[in-house]
């Protein structure tokens, strides 16, 4: 059965920070700036052309043709060029049955998505994937009615079968500001995997692939490489960073990289290098 109340994980912040976006009940976070380091990869350079042949003939040309044939010319293939990752299939809010009457205010938007933070919901792992919509509906109710937020905190959900679900309203291809990583909501998108990955749960291959796919696509919309680093200015004291600190993070990071929490759980956090690598490969194969 679906989680009856989808309680928020104890390691997640229980309230939206005092510097939350205008869509949240509290005042906006201080102005945040981000500088990406390094920038999105540009196209690989093509192989340099060989140096030109000498224009002057040698002073003593050979009297006969050389006995050994000249080496045959072989074409070399240019390295693959990066491309924008394809948009994965995303289950819309309408399709998973979001109660839009719970959402009173319109979404707010970022200038750019510089990073993706990966989370877990810390709920049960013993669910059928057909129950995923009901679980997300329960989380929506909890985030609005208990946490006092305007909408879901996360921008996307992924279940163990690898299905991606739209989270906070505002447009999956838009830089919608969420409420998921205190101090860094002003730069990022949040992706949460249904289940608990701190207390024995292990992310499935399908879930890891889906997290990589949605992260690569979301970052790609903003010209951000999924295996890069980015420097973000902390907008609050997070237990890991102080207000104003310059935090250099992976563009696909775990919640614990920005905030003092166990989220996204030990096993999911340890899978992030693989997820980053998979996301990076997608920009050459999509």
Q: Predicted regions: what is each one?
A:
Residues 1-9, 13, 17, 21, ...:
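Cell wall/extracellular polymer interaction/catalysis modules
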Residues 3-6, 75-110, 115-117, 121, ...:
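Basic/polar, cationic surfaces and motifs that engage anionic cell-wall
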Residues 150-151:
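Carboxylate/His-rich catalytic cores and anion/metal-binding grooves
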